[in-house]
Swiss-Prot record:
The keyword Kinase applies. Its main location: mitochondrion. One of its GO terms (biological process) is flagellated sperm motility. One of its GO terms (cellular component) is sperm midpiece. This is Glycerol kinase 2. Interacts with ARMC12 and PLD6. NCBIfam families: glycerol_kin, PRK00047.1. Substrate binds at residues 20, 94, 148, 259. The chain crosses the membrane at residues 526-546. Belongs to the FGGY kinase family. Pathway: Polyol metabolism; glycerol degradation via glycerol kinase pathway; sn-glycerol 3-phosphate from glycerol: step 1/1.
Length: 553
């Protein structure tokens, strides 16, 4: 006889959430959407040169195995039988590019992360090759030609890494985003691993036609990418293969969504016009536009939101992407030492409740939506001798909110219907100062689920609803209602407008710091960090000097 506790939880669904900073595995009840257990492993990032961001694909894969094993151990300690886990879904950082040897299973190069800027020259060279129609790439993909997306990262590897070139020439190479690498590895790797991706991840490569839902030969020819490198493209909800090793051997992987699309599903934004904003390493605002592609005139991306079944239609979204959100907190901790833990920033910001006229533009990787300005770099301005680390912490949080407002305004103009409230999720939403700031700066309510793991929930829902699994219903009447916390604006709209206008002045000052130069003329990245570094160092000198002159301790 089954243990009563085991019997009560019913069918379970697991979700791998593979992000830039960490990997997690979470297990949900398919009947109640209750989170039962989870485990998290933090990841390292490598910065070999200024503007380069890499990760080790093997470390990422190992972190997935570790998270699954540890979560299953925790379930066992709770007297929950892991045989109740009927499916696993995958949610992943998008655009990050992996290329590996299908004969050995070894990566041919580190994963080039979505934030990476090394391909700026590649982008400039490609932009000169665009056929007569300047909208050639965007009309097919919904994306601007940018360092952000996978095609240019793969092109760079093919141009610059000899053993990648050799593996491609010999027919040994496979390309994929992180989901492809994980699914191929988990389903057997060199022993019959499934080389696939889903439509949401494919739509971020700049090689995928979002209208026909196929790899586009014209795009592959333009980027000179051999099509035999590319994974098969499936829907976001179907059985791709079975896990071949570990605690969940034999369990199907049946859901796959890029992380921001998974959060849209997890927030249950299934109706046209519903939107969510995820606060993670970056910040990503997505609005469901239904079954039609809406092309932005205000700097937003058009992307595939989800396709929840082989025979189901694809749904689309408008997206605004901010490169640096949670990453700025990591930078304050690791580079400046202003905080010791990520949680300290809330305490510092709360201590002063204002930036004291200090504005921070964290354009470490240029500016994404709505500017798409790769020449921008981070600046800290409005400093006085009274500015301290608390004001800088507050300005860093405020910067995330200002960037969100810029995207929301662009989205309102494209959609024609202003959002009445903003649904939010992601790790940074645990910061109550940030959430209140966001409501104040947008001047609309911000609504946050008490269970913040909506990205994982979306991946689990897609996996559990797949044909052949069918333990999770996506019918509106069957969807669980998430308990929400609401943040109302607490300042006058005029104050919000003044602060926002000043922020936009700071953004203008951040642009134009980097220009293309040949390698012989020097490394432009040396100068790219000058504005922010100069302001910080000079302000510290001013503070020390002022204290010395005034006789302050």
């Amino acid at each position: 006889m089954a243990d009563p506790k085991t019997a009560a939880v019913g069918p379970l669904v697991g979700a791998v959430v593979q992000g830039t900073d960490s990997t997690r595995f979470l297990v949900f009840s398919s009947k109640t959407a209750e989170l039962l257990s989870h485990h998290k492993v933090e990841l390292t990032q490598e910065f070999p040169k200024e503007g380069w961001v890499e990760q080790d694909p093997k470390e990422i894969l190992q972190s997935v195995y570790e998270c699954i094993a540890r979560t299953c151990e925790k379930l066992d300690e709770m007297n929950i039988d892991i045989s109740n886990i009927k499916a696993v879904g995958i949610s992943n950082q998008r655009e990050t590019t992996v290329i590996w040897d299908k004969l050995t299973g070894e990566p041919l190069y580190n994963a080039v992360v979505w934030l990476d800027l090394r391909t700026q020259t590649t982008v400039e060279d490609l932009s000169k090759k665009i056929p007569g129609n300047s909208n050639f790439v965007k009309s097919k993909t919904g994306l601007p030609l940018s360092t952000y997306f996978s095609a240019v990262k793969l092109r760079w590897m093919l141009d610059n890494v000899r053993h990648v070139q050799k593996a491609v020439e010999e027919g040994r190479a496979l390309f994929g985003t992180i989901d492809s690498w994980l699914i191929w590895s988990l389903t057997g790797g060199v022993n019959g691993g499934v080389h696939c991706t889903d439509v949401t991840n494919a739509s971020r490569t700049m090689l995928f036609n979002i209208h026909s839902l196929e790899w586009d030969k014209e795009l592959c020819d333009f980027f000179e990418i051999p099509m035999d490198l590319l994974p098969n493209v499936f829907s976001s909800s179907e059985i791709y293969g079975l896990i071949k090793t570990g605690a969940l051997e034999g369990v199907p992987i049946s859901g796959c969504l890029g992380d921001q699309c998974a959060a849209l599903v997890g927030q249950m934004c299934f109706q046209e016009g519903q939107a969510k904003n995820t606060y993670g390493t970056g910040c990503f605002l997505l609005c469901n536009t239904g079954r039609k592609c809406v092309f932005s005139e205000h700097g937003l991306l058009t992307t595939i939101a989800y396709k929840l079944g082989k025979e189901k239609p694809a749904y689309y979204a408008l997206e605004g992407s901010v490169a640096i959100a949670g990453a700025v907190i990591r930078w304050l901790r690791d580079n400046l030492g202003i905080i010791e833990t990520s949680g300290d920033i809330e305490k510092l910001a709360k201590e002063v409740g204002t930036s004291y006229g200090c504005y921070f533009v964290p354009a470490f990787s240029g500016l994404y939506a709505p500017y798409w300005e790769p020449s921008a770099r981070g600046i800290l301005c409005g400093l006085t001798q009274f500015t301290n680390k608390c004001h800088i912490a507050f300005a860093a949080l405020e910067a995330v909110c200002f960037q969100t407002r810029e995207i929301l305004e662009a989205m309102n103009r494209d959609c024609g219907i202003p959002l009445r409230h903003l649904q939010v999720d992601g790790g940074m939403t645990n910061n109550k100062v940030l959430m209140q700031l966001q409501a104040d700066i947008l001047h609309i309510p911000v609504i946050k689920p008490f269970m913040p793991e909506t990205t994982a929930l979306g991946a689990a829902m897609a996996a559990g609803a797949a044909e052949g699994v069918s333990v999770w219903s996506l019918e509106p009447q069957a969807l669980s209602v998430l308990r929400m916390e609401r943040f109302e604006p607490q300042i006058q709209a005029t104050e919000s407008e003044i602060r926002y206008a000043t922020w936009k002045k700071a953004v203008m000052k951040s642009m134009g710091w980097v220009t293309s130069q040949s390698p012989e003329s020097g490394d432009p990245s040396i100068f790219s960090s000058m504005p922010l570094g100069f302001f910080i160092v000079s302000s510290m000198v001013m503070l020390i000097g002022a204290r010395y002159i005034s006789g302050m301790p």
